[in-house]
Curated annotation (Swiss-Prot):
Gene3D superfamilies linked to this entry: 6.10.280.190, f41 fragment of flagellin, C-terminal domain, f41 fragment of flagellin, middle domain, f41 fragment of flagellin, N-terminal domain, Flagellar export chaperone, C-terminal domain
Function, in words: Flagellin is the subunit protein which polymerizes to form the filaments of bacterial flagella.
More details: Individual Salmonella serotypes usually alternate between the production of 2 antigenic forms of flagella, termed phase 1 and phase 2, each specified by separate structural genes.
Recorded family membership: Belongs to the bacterial flagellin family.
Predominant place of localization: secreted
PANTHER family: FLAGELLIN
Designated gene of the protein: fliC
Protein name according to UniProt: Flagellin
UniProt keyword terms in alphabetical order: Bacterial flagellum, Secreted
CC terms in the record's Gene Ontology section: bacterial-type flagellum; extracellular region
Length: 505
């Protein structure tokens, strides 16, 4: 090897190796101090790209796990509100069962309906005010997508439904609505109710006053109706004529009548104090004037004495040919029982409903007047109409009864099958709660899976970019030794040109 001064090849070689060991030492120290094998792309370009993708995935999945927890929180918030709605519905159902019991008074039903209304209003309040982070969860139908992955489309959808009184089918729910009015309701709920029921017996029409029961004819100018004392038939006559008995008349009978001749003959043939029978009546001879048959006879009718006077006798050789007869009282035969009476008429009794029924009268519609308005009731009295519209009894806020027509009642009517309506609402709430419960379990599963994935990805990234301390410490020790050796050798290499000077001595 040539001996030169200008170029110290050994020094240059030593310096180069010293630089290499310095670079190795710097790299080892950097890795040991950062804990990373890859601190820049130059350390491992491919590894750095792979590790960076892992980092993106890990951060995305970590955030996705937090998102899933938010999803659980949303579901729990919504389910908690639904639990309160369920509690209110259960109370409404309990009250509805109570309301359907027939023992409740009007005030009871009003109190029950008042609480039901408050419960329904609370359901609407919960629906309108329940929110999560400013998002209302029950006031409208909504699909909320929760990002549970690191990439597009990796979502779980929470199906939020509008849950309020209307959506539950309970809008206008009422257990104390107006009920169809009946004649009985009108009589019991209002004062000064008047009117009449109509009846028909053949071609004849009648009215029966709903308060007094008085029966009159169904006409513009009605007549009072009576029951014929003789035959029980309906009539407008207040009495029936009894039959006058010819034997007992206060006016003188025409001379020669059979009754006068018979009585005169009895007097003629008897003496005072004698009795005799004539036409089923027992007479006593009170006075006898002469032998011609003039005189007086008497009998007792209904506890009263009746005297017959016989006069104007015309006799033949053996018989009375003519006479006049005059009674002290007029006597009649009753049309009812054929008995003697002093009354020329028998009074007919005023007709009653039972008399109409006895004459096979058929009930028709009724006319009922309440507060000046005339309503029509059907034959059974369970339907009241005005101008063709069915009437209902309603209660004002102060509890006063009032009549409203079917149009007004439609908006306030009692709910048909209230328990079925509540059960349907409960089923809908249960379905939504069930869905939310299932989605919470799904989020729990997603969170567990995300945690496992993040753990595995961290392990994979660690294997790529984390420093192996055993290796790096070994590399650092090696580089330090090389540095020390290189420094020492460089000093010796720098002394080599001094050897050339020895040749010049």
């Amino acid at each position: 090897m040539a001996q030169v001064i200008n170029t110290n090849s050994l020094s240059l070689l030593t310096q180069n190796n010293l630089n290499k060991s310095q670079s190795s030492l710097s790299s080892a120290i950097e890795r040991l101090s950062s804990g990373l094998r890859i601190n820049s792309a130059k350390d491992d370009a491919a590894g750095q790209a792979i590790a960076n993708r892992f980092t993106s995935n890990i951060k995305g999945l970590t955030q996705a796990s937090r998102n899933a927890n938010d999803g659980i929180s949303i579901a729990q918030t919504t389910e908690g509100a639904l639990n309160e709605i369920n509690n209110n519905l259960q109370r409404v159902r309990e009250l509805s069962v109570q309301a359907t019991n027939g023992t409740n008074s009007d005030s009871d039903l009003k109190s029950i309906q008042d609480e039901i209304q408050q419960r329904l209003e609370e359901i609407d309040r919960v629906s309108n005010q329940t929110q999560f982070n400013g998002v209302k969860v029950l006031s409208q139908d909504n699909q909320m997508k929760i990002q549970v992955g690191a990439n597009d489309g990796e979502t779980i959808t929470i199906d939020l439904q509008k849950i309020d009184v209307k959506s539950l089918g309970l809008d206008g729910f009422n257990v104390n609505g107006p009920k169809e009015a009946t004649v009985g309701d009108l009589k019991s709920s209002f004062k000064n109710v008047t009117g009449y029921d109509t009846y028909a017996a053949g071609a004849d029409k009648y009215r029966v006053d709903i308060n007094s029961g008085a029966v009159v004819t169904d006409a513009a100018a009605p007549d009072k109706v009576y029951v014929n004392a003789a035959n029980g038939q309906l009539t407008t006559d207040d009495a029936e004529n009894n039959t006058a008995v010819d034997l007992f008349k206060t006016t003188k009978s025409t001379a020669g009548t059979a009754e006068a001749k018979a009585i005169a003959g009895a007097i003629k043939g008897g003496k005072e104090g004698d009795t005799f029978d004539y036409k089923g009546v027992t007479f006593t001879i009170d006075t006898k004037t002469g032998d011609g048959g003039n005189g007086k006879v008497s009998t007792t009718i209904n506890g009263e004495k009746v005297t017959l006077t016989v006069a104007d006798i015309a006799t033949g050789a053996t018989n009375v040919n003519a006479a006049t007869l005059q009674s002290s009282k007029n006597v009649y035969t009753s049309v009812v029982n054929g008995q003697f009476t002093f009354d020329d008429k028998t009074k007919n009794e005023s007709a009653k409903l039972s008399d109409l029924e006895a004459n096979n009268a058929v009930k028709g519609e009724s006319k009922i007047t309440v507060n000046g308005a005339e309503y029509t009731a059907n034959a059974t009295g369970d339907k009241i109409t005005l101008a063709g519209k069915t009437m209902f009894i309603d209660k004002t806020a102060s509890g006063v009864s009032t009549l409203i027509n079917e149009d007004a009642a439609a908006a306030k009517k009692s709910t048909a099958n209230p328990l079925a309506s509540i059960d349907s609402a409960l089923s809908k709430v249960d379905a939504v709660r069930s869905s939310l419960g299932a989605i919470q379990n799904r989020f729990d599963s997603a969170i567990t899976n995300l945690g496992n994935t993040v753990t595995n990805l961290n392990s994979a990234r660690s294997r790529i970019e984390d420093a192996d301390y055993a290796t790096e410490v070994s590399n650092m020790s090696k580089a330090q030794i090389l540095q020390q050796a290189g420094t020492s050798v460089l000093a010796q290499a720098n002394q080599v040109p001094q050897n050339v000077l020895s040749l010049l001595r």
